């Protein structure tokens, strides 16, 4: 009846306004007309409900804890491109048969240097350390929380695990300094009693080839490998034109979170 009074034709869910009502353009305009005819005083008043405060997901909380802990040990955050050059794999001496060389290729890249999605965050960190060294920064300690892109099948999207990568050089930088920083980060994140095993041919990370064989280690939480750390191999260091000993670490955030003890108990 209200629509007839307003000379609005109704056909199912479609309303056709008369030609002289150019002000009726969208559903809100029709609702306003119906409310006006029905009477605003006849519409019951309701109290506006408050919007619930948003909260972080467990993954976001864990990532924030890691980031805060990394900043607390003296690292500065960086943000690098997720796409790299295939030549970066040669610079870190990655084996020719490594699965990390199987990448997601970008169909319209900006250039050869950004033509594939990275399967490891290590080259991005080393490129940034190299840039800082060339700009004569005497000592740096950097970190990045970023994704790697690991292909699964031709018709499926790649996996996108989160990684925490740390890189440093300078007079105060050495293997044990980096190890102490990583231990502090892990303890703060709720991963206690982690163990370190010297890198060997059976190391579960292909990037180990970029590290000095006698000054590197794989990090374990129980039986699960959660990362690695060590001094960059002299050959790789030379590939990046870094003229001083350089140290890197990578932690697997997605693998770490289920193992972390995030609940605090008091005795």
What is each model feature region?
Residues 1-267:
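Extended beta-strand-rich architecture
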């Amino acid at each position: 009846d209200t629509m007839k009074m307003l000379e609005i034709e109704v056909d199912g869910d479609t309303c056709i306004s008369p030609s002289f009502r150019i002000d009726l353009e969208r559903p809100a305009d029709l609702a306003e007309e119906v409310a006006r005819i029905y009477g605003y005083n006849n519409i019951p008043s309701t109290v506006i409900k408050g919007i619930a405060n948003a909260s972080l997901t467990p993954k976001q909380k864990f990532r924030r804890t890691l980031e805060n802990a990394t900043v607390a040990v003296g690292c500065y955050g960086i943000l690098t491109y997720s796409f790299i050059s295939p030549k970066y794999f040669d610079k870190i001496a990655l084996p020719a048969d490594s699965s990390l060389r199987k990448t997601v290729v970008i169909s319209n890249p900006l250039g050869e240097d950004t033509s594939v999605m990275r399967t490891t965050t290590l080259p991005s960190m080393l490129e940034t350390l190299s840039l800082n060294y060339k700009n004569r920064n005497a000592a740096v300690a950097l970190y990045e929380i970023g994704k790697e892109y690991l292909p699964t099948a031709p018709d499926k999207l790649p996996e996108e695990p989160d990684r925490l990568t740390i890189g440093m050089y300078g007079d105060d930088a050495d293997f044990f300094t980096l190890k102490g920083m990583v231990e502090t980060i892990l303890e703060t994140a709720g991963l206690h009693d982690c163990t370190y095993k010297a890198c060997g041919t059976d190391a579960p990370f292909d990037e180990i080839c970029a590290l000095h064989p006698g000054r590197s280690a794989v990090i374990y939480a129980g039986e699960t490998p959660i990362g690695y750390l060590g001094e960059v191999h002299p050959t790789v260091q030379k590939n990046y034109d870094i003229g001083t000993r350089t140290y890197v670490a990578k932690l697997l955030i997605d693998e770490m979170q289920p193992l972390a003890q995030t609940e605090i108990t008091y005795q």
